[in-house]
């Protein structure tokens, strides 16, 4: 659903942020 989609997007952004940190 929408919540799981948002969770996937947030997880992806978090991964990118960690990679950039």
UniProtKB/Swiss-Prot annotation:
GO terms for cellular component: extracellular region. Expressed by the skin glands. Its main location: secreted. Keywords: Amidation, Amphibian defense peptide, Antimicrobial, Secreted. It is found in: Secreted. The modification Alanine amide is found at residue 21. GO terms for biological process: defense response. Belongs to the gastrin/cholecystokinin family. Magainin subfamily. Antimicrobial peptide. This is Peptide PGLa-BM2.
């Amino acid at each position: 659903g929408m919540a799981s989609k948002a969770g996937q997007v947030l997880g992806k952004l978090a991964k990118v942020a960690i990679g950039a940190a």
